[in-house]
From Swiss-Prot, chain B:
InterPro entries: Tyr_Pase-like_PTPLA. Pfam families: PTPLA. It catalyses: a very-long-chain (3R)-3-hydroxyacyl-CoA = a very-long-chain (2E)-enoyl-CoA + H2O; (3R)-hydroxyhexadecanoyl-CoA = (2E)-hexadecenoyl-CoA + H2O; (3R)-hydroxyoctadecanoyl-CoA = (2E)-octadecenoyl-CoA + H2O; (3R)-hydroxyeicosanoyl-CoA = (2E)-eicosenoyl-CoA + H2O. The modification N-acetylalanine is found at residue 2. This is Very-long-chain (3R)-3-hydroxyacyl-CoA dehydratase 2. Belongs to the very long-chain fatty acids dehydratase HACD family. May interact with enzymes of the ELO family (including ELOVL1); with those enzymes that mediate condensation, the first of the four steps of the reaction cycle responsible for fatty acids elongation, may be part of a larger fatty acids elongase complex. Interacts with BCAP31. Interacts with TECR. It is a multi-pass membrane protein. Catalyzes the third of the very long-chain fatty acids (VLCFA) elongation four-step cycle (condensation, reduction, dehydration, and reduction). This endoplasmic reticulum-elongation process is characterized by the addition of two carbons to the lipid chain through each cycle. This enzyme catalyzes the dehydration of the 3-hydroxyacyl-CoA intermediate into trans-2,3-enoyl-CoA, within each cycle of elongation. Therefore, it participates in the production of various VLCFAs involved in multiple biological processes as precursors of membrane lipids and lipid mediators.
Length: 308, 254
């Protein structure tokens, strides 16, 4: 019979890396990656990018060999994506850090503030409230990572964990330092301001969680299908009528709430940076929705209703 | 760093042959260049900048001859220095709108570091304006920029004299360390005055629950030179080898 053969070349040097002799026509790229790993064990499947053209797009794991535009000998080009780490690991590390770090400042662990303040407690209610909110936020994120989110990619490059952790941990330490400082100044408009901010925070946390659940239900376990998200019976999801990524909208809202609650400039700066990044992601997601779905609702904006 | 970054990272302001920049291989590929109107604008921009830095150079020489010493020459070229160095902010815009193929991030770092030194250090801390270290970096920047902007001008017009290319990729060997020394010494000289005046600093308690110590910030800036400067310097050395030997080979076949 005419069983396809696969040769794998290095995308940059065109060096022949591997020749696979009798490959099943129904074989998927994932299976080919596994075969390739056997001859080159240092390149586990997650770090392989195989493509038909050295400069082209990566083939997907689900693609079937027979359905690709190749002859009896398929030539695939290989690029090493570098050491990979699972998304779950990255998320857990990024989020556990701020949770723990904030508490170090809250409990005024030694060497942060002056010695006379070690293990003392703030006399401002808002400081205790802020600790609860901040901790709740990151515990929620950890639980969502473990039980709610369905990731479409298994891994990301290893260097991302250093970059991401520096960002999250760094900002957490910076804001926690001021909020829990002995010289902290409570909000100008007192309890009114704190109550309003807390309401915003809670509503946005609920909203964000609702969106995460709605997105989860959109995609069956183990699959990588993509569908247009629509509002459900949960009123928090009605924001889908106006934006593509309401989870980001609610996330920004939560941090604005927290900034108003603590009246702390570093929190406001963190919100601004986060908003910038999430806007970039939302615009990208919005663009890919538009490209993939002809019937995508035209009223929707990426992240801010009617505006952005 | 401002001096170093300006030479190493900037590959832009138009032009074709033999440009070197951070990470860009020198290529003789015909790239789809900017349109005629854009090219005209960029040529004008680069000519004006070349002229501006020449004005600063001439100003320095005249002031030296008039005073008879090289101390406190800053005051004679303060205004054109501020104007033309700040004008370089336009280069960030050029990258952002795509008329120049350099990285926005890299260009931003290089221009902002120069602008920082001019305004946030030299202008803000009047006491350092009479320091000799200021002259050190001003001379380094002036020579570098005259060569750099004329390099871009000629590249845009597709008539790059080898001398300019040689100068750009050789003089940095001395100008870099000179500029960096001038910059570091100036920042160092500014420190006690910053501390004394509490310049640009805010302390707790305040209603924004924020603090900033400009003195500590300047020290961090100085420390950042340690990892950054060698990288930029050796990148330029590497580029020099690649670009100047490449040209030599071409000349052989003429």
């Amino acid at each position: 019979g005419r069983q396809p053969r696969v040769e794998i070349l290095d995308a940059k040097t065109r060096e022949k890396l591997c020749f696979l002799d009798k490959v099943e026509p129904q074989a998927t790229i994932a299976e080919i990656k596994n075969l390739f790993t056997k001859t080159h064990p240092q390149w586990y499947p997650a770090r392989q990018s195989l493509r038909l053209d050295p400069k082209g797009k990566s083939l997907k794991d689900e693609d079937v060999l027979q359905k690709l535009p190749v002859g009896t000998t398929a030539t695939l080009y290989f690029r090493d994506l570098g050491a990979q780490i699972s998304w779950v690991t990255v998320f857990l590390t990024e989020y556990a850090g701020p949770l723990f770090i904030y508490l170090l400042f809250y409990f005024r662990v030694p060497f942060i503030y002056g010695r006379k303040y070690d293990f003392t407690s703030s006399r401002h209610t808002v400081v205790h409230l802020a600790c609860i909110c901040h901790s709740f936020h990151y515990i929620k994120r950890l639980l969502e990572t473990l039980f709610v989110h369905r990731f479409s990619h298994g891994t990301m490059p290893l260097r991302n964990i250093f970059k991401n952790c520096t960002y999250y941990w760094g900002f957490a330490a910076w804001m926690a330092y001021y909020i829990n400082h002995p010289l902290y100044t409570p909000p100008t408009y007192g309890a009114q301001q704190v109550k309003l901010a807390l309401a915003i925070f809670v509503i946005c946390q609920l909203g964000n969680f609702s969106i995460h659940m709605a997105l989860r239900d959109l995609r069956p376990a183990g699959s990588k299908t993509r569908k247009i998200p629509y509002p459900t019976r949960n009123p928090f999801t009605w924001l889908f009528l106006l934006v593509s990524c309401p989870n980001y909208t609610y996330e920004v809202g939560s941090w604005i709430g927290f900034a108003i609650m603590t009246q702390c400039l570093p929190v406001a700066l963190f919100s601004l940076v986060g908003f910038t990044q999430m806007t970039i992601w939302a615009k990208g997601k919005h663009r890919s929705y538009l490209k993939e779905f002809r019937d995508y609702p035209p009223l929707r904006m990426p992240i801010i209703p009617f505006l952005l | 760093m401002a001096a170093a970054a300006a030479i190493a990272a900037s590959k832009g302001n138009g032009g074709g042959g033999g440009r070197a920049g951070a990470g860009e291989a020198s290529s003789s590929r015909r790239k789809k260049g900017p349109g005629p109107l854009t090219t005209a604008y960029l040529v004008i921009y680069n000519v004006v900048m070349t002229a501006g830095w020449l004005v600063i150079a001439v100003g320095l020489v005249r002031a030296y001859l008039a005073k008879g010493s090289y101390h406190s020459l800053y005051y004679s070229i303060e205004k054109p220095l501020k104007f033309f160095q700040t004008g370089a902010l336009l280069e960030i815009l050029h990258c952002a709108i795509g008329i120049v193929p350099s990285s926005v991030v890299l260009t931003s770092i290089q221009v902002m570091s120069r602008v920082f030194l001019i305004w946030a250090v030299t202008h803000s801390v009047k006491e350092v304006q009479s320091e000799d270290s200021v002259l050190l970096f001003v001379i380094a920047w002036t020579i570098t920029e005259i060569i750099r902007y004329s390099f871009y001008t000629f590249s845009l017009l597709n008539h790059l004299p080898y001398l300019i290319k040689w100068a750009r990729y050789t003089l940095f060997i001395v100008l870099y360390p000179m500029g960096v020394s001038g910059e570091l010494l100036t920042i160092y000289a500014a420190l006690p005055f910053v501390r004394q005046a509490g310049l640009y600093s805010i302390s707790l308690p305040n209603k924004y629950n924020f603090s900033f110590d400009y003195y500590a910030f300047l020290i961090l800036i100085m420390i950042s030179y340690i990892p950054l400067f060698p990288q930029l310097y050796f990148h330029m050395i590497h580029q020099r080898r690649k670009i100047l030997s490449h040209t030599e080979e071409h000349k052989k076949f003429e």
